[in-house]
Curated annotation (Swiss-Prot):
Entry superkingdom: Eukaryota
Pathway(s) of this molecule: Protein modification; protein ubiquitination
Zinc fingers (FYVE-type), renumbered ranges: 17-88
EC number per UniProt: 2.3.2.27
PROSITE patterns to which the protein is assigned, alphabetical: ZF_FYVE, ZF_RING_2
Record field: catalytic activity: S-ubiquitinyl-[E2 ubiquitin-conjugating enzyme]-L-cysteine + [acceptor protein]-L-lysine = [E2 ubiquitin-conjugating enzyme]-L-cysteine + N(6)-ubiquitinyl-[acceptor protein]-L-lysine
Gene name as annotated: PIB1
Topological type in the membrane: Peripheral membrane protein
GO molecular function, one term: phosphatidylinositol-3-phosphate binding
Organism (species): Saccharomyces cerevisiae (strain ATCC 204508 / S288c) (Baker's yeast)
Name recorded for this polypeptide: E3 ubiquitin-protein ligase PIB1
Length: 286
């Protein structure tokens, strides 16, 4: 198998069965009933419960490990829980059609259906077309503006990148965060001190599941964002922390940003981050 140099798991290896007597994550001893299962991302051996994710990898950044001299395995690949969380956070999981799993399919505006009608050359239909184009253009500009705002933050640790003096410092910060995330992804720790350093880093701790609420969500299932107290409507982008609290994505991002500013001011420096699993709701309660 040819391994690309830019794959985040190019240092991972397929662990031999005889090396593992218990699950790498939950430490359950293997037996006749508790079988060994390899994670195709990190190569470690886990029990079935800790490798219950079957996903497709971004082949440009992640290569699927397999046993030496074995037949080529087809996706989806069995993946341990930790690798799944990290790959999802790094946008390295794709659907069977090779699309980012976080991206929802683009919906066609209802008015656009009228454009395919045989007798759609009337003035009324022309007005419908114009309105539809205007609405689409406004939506696109809104999405572009939102994307530009997100580009101001580090995709790994959520630090405000506008705080850095130049592009070189910004690039160095992002590369450092990516390297820390890769080390955590590959379970590579050289010492106890390094282990503590990785666990304390924002790249290791900042984990948030970002997704859009399903359009099929019923009214009874719609919940209120604890930050803005507005309903999280179907189709809206939300973020779920490790405590399972869910917020509007923009609300939780703004909270992280403000919290980081407060932390930086208290520490007397310009660089700070807030853990994405440090919930603003629990912060207020406790």
């Amino acid at each position: 198998m040819v391994i690309k140099e830019d794959c985040i798991n190019n240092l991972a290896r397929w662990q031999a069965d005889e090396e593992a007597h218990s699950c790498f994550q939950c430490k359950t001893n293997f037996s006749f009933l508790v079988r060994r299962h390899h994670c195709r991302c990190c190569g470690r051996i886990f029990c079935s419960s800790c490798t219950e994710n079957f996903v497709n990898y971004n082949k440009k950044r992640v290569h699927a490990l397999q046993k030496k001299n074995s037949d080529v395995e087809s996706p989806p690949y069995r993946t341990c829980n930790e690798c799944y969380d990290n790959l999802l956070h790094l946008n390295l999981l794709v659907s069977s059609t090779n699309r980012d799993v976080r991206l929802s399919q683009t919906s066609v505006p209802p008015n656009a259906l009228a454009l395919s009608a045989p007798d759609s050359n009337t003035d009324e239909d022309a007005e419908i077309l114009e309105d539809s184009v205007d609405q689409s253009g406004t939506a696109c500009r809104s999405e572009e503006s939102s994307q530009n705002e997100e580009d101001h933050f580090c995709p790994i640790c959520n630090s405000d990148l506008t705080q850095f003096p130049d592009e070189e410092e910004t690039r160095k910060h992002v590369e450092d965060c990516i390297q820390r995330a890769e080390n955590a992804q590959q379970h590579t720790n050289t010492s106890d001190a390094a282990d503590d350093s990785v666990k304390e880093s924002p790249a290791f701790q900042n984990r948030m599941l970002v997704y859009k609420i399903s359009p099929n969500t019923t009214d009874n299932a719609i919940k209120e964002c604890p930050i803005c107290f507005e309903n999280m409507e179907p189709g809206e982008k939300v973020g779920r922390l490790e405590c399972l609290c869910v917020f509007h994505y923009k609300c939780i991002k703004n909270w992280f940003h403000k919290r980081a500013q407060m932390t930086a001011a208290q520490k007397g420096n310009g660089h700070a981050f807030v853990k994405r699993n440090f919930c603003p709701f629990h912060d207020a309660v406790f």
